[in-house]
Structure formats: structure tokens, C-alpha cells
A protein has these predicted regions:
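Flavin-dependent oxidoreductase catalytic cores
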Residues: 1-364
């Protein structure tokens, strides 16, 4: 059985250990362009011993993100800054991946969705035509080419948390009656075709991850059977790893603003490893590696997840924001600057402000 600090493979990319920094928005960008603050932030996480860093969602189009602090990849002029970013991460020994995302019905303007169903109340997202869907697939592929030119080891398609691709995957949000809906094959088509286009343009060996919701916590949404079907279709399309999140944390207060009353962020009182049971479920049938996430904080717990085969890799977001040296401290010992799960980091970004951290004085 593998150990927490054994290397592992994601596609053709070797990862030095099983600890991964997942994509979390920082608002450190300057109108889409990489800044020195962003480079330093991610380099610091890599220096702390993470096996891989998945950089926050970069947007292949203007006008689909939250604001000026969101990272972009819509123009060739952005490649230079992204190259500095990937280079800084890899110089510290971590693999570098870049998430690609389209906010869809959660965009600050020009909201779109598979079926015109809103995520944010009092908005009317446009239902995408087939021609527009194909353009979006091509836009993701063009962004992947830029990411490859910038030196990233691979890309991740953001298919979770009710952003655009997530809405296509979800029976709750996708009510289309054409080839991009109806059943799991149709609902996954946009993601599968995008994987194919990325592999065609970047090479079959270029690593592609897809982040998906294991559950969505509402009637008519993704359940265990639907998840199994989604993973099967993604594997046939050539996905290299499943980054398994979930969106079934009950949050009724959100219904004042949104049409969905669940979120992906475990609260402070949530049990450790809240989503890891879903990873164990997927490991029963998946042929590609599985990344798990969800309030994983203790070394012994993390070691057990890997040694028992619950997951192949562990993503730790808020714990690595609070203490980027956590992987090295797991390995060598040392007092950990523990996350208190106050969500100051996420709250700031949700207001389109720079990430802050209550317990890490370097993030302010």
C-alpha cells in the first residue's frame, strides 16, 4: 500500500507525495494577469512541501468571473505571467496544474447556463445554443494550449460547485432535450468533448483533471448512480484523474440569494474528512486516480486515507492557507499553525477582496 509521502502518478506527471493544494480563489490577480503577490503565494505553498499545486480557476473569457481579481487566460499576453507562476511552483519541487473555469450562472454579468435555470436569484441566465457550447469547448481547449505553453503540467476542468460545467453535469440544472442533456451521456458531453479537444491540441499525454460534485444534496441532483455514470463517461473521454469535491453541505441561509441551499465548504463543526466516504465509493470502480478533499487536518487521518486506498491523493485547502509548511511538518515534525475554519479567506474572496487569513500573518 502507498504511504502519504510516497510519490504517485497523475497521468504522466509524477507527484512527489500525496498532498495537494486544490484551487482556491485569491483575488491576487490584476485584471486577469498574474501578479508578484500571486507568484509568491503559490511558491510559498510549494516550498512548504505540497506534492502538487492546482492553481485557482483561470478564466478563458473576459466578463465571466467575479471581478478584477480573478485570474484570466483569455489572451496570449497572459502566458508570460502564467509562465512565471508555474516556474515558481515547479522550482520548489511541486507539480503545477491550472484549473480552467467558466462561472456560467454565477458570473458577475452575461450569465449563461445549460437550460436557462438561474443559480443566483433575480438573474436570467441565457440558455446556450449548441453553437455556443461548441465555442465554449474550443475556448477551454485554447486556454489549455496557453497553459501548456506556460509550463503547467496539466489542466483541471472545473465541473463542480454549480459553475457552468457543473450545471451541465447536474440533472438538477440541466433540463436540455438535445445531445447535451437527457441522460448522463448527454449531460457529460460538453466535458468529454472538451477533454478530447484538449488532448488533440496538447497531446494525448497532457494531463487533464476534472473536478466534480460527488453529491449535491437536493432532490433530483447528482447521486451515487449518477456519479458512477459521470466518472465512466469521463474515463472513456481520457480524463487522467477525478478531483472529487461535493456540494451537499446544508446551508439554508443561502436560499435567500441562491436557488440551491447547499455548499461545498465544511463548517468548523463538520467531522474531519466529511467527503472521504464518497472517494472510497468512487475508488471501487474508477480506473484513474481519485483526489479527496473536505476538512482533512490530521497526519494520522491523512495517512490512513492513503494506506487504506480510500483515495490516491488528498487535497488540503484551508489548512495549507493557514500553514503552507504543513506537509513538511507532517514529514519532519513541528508545530502546525492550524486552520480554525473561520472562513475569513473565503469570505473576503466572495466579496471580491484579496484573500486574508486569521492565523497566517503573511496573508493579509
Amino acid at each position: 500500500m502507498a504511504g502519504l509521502f510516497d510519490s504517485g502518478m497523475i497521468g504522466k506527471t509524477r507527484i512527489r507525495n500525496r498532498l495537494i493544494m486544490p484551487p482556491v480563489a485569491t483575488c491576487y490577480s490584476d485584471n486577469g494577469y498574474v501578479t508578484e503577490d500571486m507568484v509568491n503565494y503559490y511558491k510559498r505553498i510549494a516550498e512548504g512541501g505540497a506534492g502538487a499545486v492546482i492553481v485557482e480557476a483561470a478564466h478563458p473569457w473576459q466578463g465571466i468571473a467575479y471581478g478584477s481579481g480573478a485570474l484570466g487566460i483569455w489572451d496570449d499576453s497572459m502566458v508570460e505571467g502564467l509562465s512565471r507562476l508555474s516556474g515558481a511552483i515547479k522550482s520548489a519541487g511541486a507539480a503545477a496544474f491550472l484549473q480552467l473555469g467558466h462561472n456560467g450562472p454565477q458570473a458577475s454579468e452575461n450569465q449563461v447556463s445549460p437550460s436557462g435555470i438561474p443559480y443566483i436569484r433575480d438573474t436570467s441566465p441565457k440558455e446556450l445554443s449548441i453553437a455556443e457550447i461548441i465555442d465554449i469547448e474550443d475556448g477551454f481547449a485554447a486556454a489549455a494550449v496557453r497553459a501548456q505553453k506556460a509550463g503547467f503540467d496539466g489542466v483541471e476542468l472545473h465541473g463542480a460547485h454549480f459553475y457552468l460545467l457543473s450545471c451541465f453535469l447536474s440533472p438538477l440544472m440541466n433540463k436540455r432535450t438535445d445531445i447535451y442533456g437527457i441522460d448522463s451521456e448527454g449531460r457529460t458531453r460538453i466535458v468529454c468533448e472538451t477533454i478530447g479537444k484538449i488532448k488533440e491540441r496538447c497531446g494525448r499525454d497532457y494531463t487533464v483533471s476534472v473536478r466534480v460534485n460527488a453529491r449535491e444534496g437536493m432532490e433530483g441532483s447528482i447521486d451515487g448512480d449518477e456519479l458512477k455514470a459521470i466518472v465512466g463517461h469521463l474515463e472513456k473521454a481520457g480524463v487522467d484523474v477525478i478531483d472529487l469535491s461535493s456540494n451537499d453541505v446544508s446551508f439554508p441561509a443561502q436560499l435567500k440569494r441562491c436557488t440551491v441551499g447547499t455548499v461545498s465548504i465544511p463548517r468548523a463543526d463538520a467531522p474531519q474528512g466529511i467527503f472521504t466516504g464518497y472517494a472510497a465509493e468512487v475508488k471501487e470502480y474508477a480506473k484513474v486516480p481519485v483526489i479527496t478533499v473536505g476538512k482533512i487536518t490530521d497526519k494520522e487521518f491523512a495517512e490512513e486515507l492513503i494506506s487504506k486506498g480510500t483515495a490516491d491523493f488528498i487535497a488540503m485547502a484551508r489548512p495549507l492557507i493557514a500553514d503552507p509548511d504543513l506537509p513538511n511538518k507532517f514529514l519532519n515534525g513541528g508545530e502546525i499553525n492550524s486552520c480554525i475554519y473561520c472562513n475569513a479567506c473565503i469570505g473576503a474572496v466572495a466579496r471580491n477582496r484579496r484573500m486574508v487569513c486569521t492565523v497566517n500573518p503573511d496573508i493579509k
